[in-house]
Amino acid sequence: MHRQFLSSRCQNLFFKFKLLLFEVNQMQYVYIFIGGALGALLRYLISFLNTDGGFPIGTLIANLTGAFVMGLLTALTIAFFSNHPTLKKAITTGFLGALTTFSTFQLELIHMFDHQQFITLLLYAVTSYVFGILLCYVGIKLGGGLS
């Protein structure tokens, strides 16, 4: 009985994956890929602002910029992207997904902890979270005013 349940779940997941991969607008994948490549390139260039052992300003800038733009685009979606969902996915999932980097942020916090840089760790974490939420909110409000 348990084996039959798992088999039907696997078939259901496979069907959903097949549906996503082959029956969705396939150009969407190309746009997300291009957006992701551009976001990753910008993220790489911004990372040069980081210094060894110093405050990771490049990661902070990338993440806060991404939070603001994501908020802005959330509000502008209705006005400007309703007829262009593929472009919205290219910008949000592709570009902003590659630009912002939660995993690097976490790794930098662990690095600070390992090097007993507790003040810097606290400052970085609080700044990232508080200003990330604030900038996302400002982006939503600004975008709402523009649409």
Swiss-Prot record:
Pfam families: CRCB (PF02537). It comes from Staphylococcus aureus (strain COL). The keyword Cell wall biogenesis/degradation does not apply. NCBIfam families: crcB, PRK14201.1. Belongs to the fluoride channel Fluc/FEX (TC 1.A.43) family. Fluoride-specific ion channel. Important for reducing fluoride concentration in the cell, thus reducing its toxicity. Na(+) binds at G97, T100. The lineage of its organism: Bacteria, Bacillati, Bacillota, Bacilli, Bacillales. It comes from the Bacteria. GO terms for cellular component: plasma membrane. One of its GO terms (molecular function) is metal ion binding. It is found in: Cell membrane. It is a multi-pass membrane protein. It catalyses: fluoride(in) = fluoride(out). The keyword Ion transport applies. HAMAP family: FluC (MF_00454). This is Fluoride-specific ion channel FluC 1.
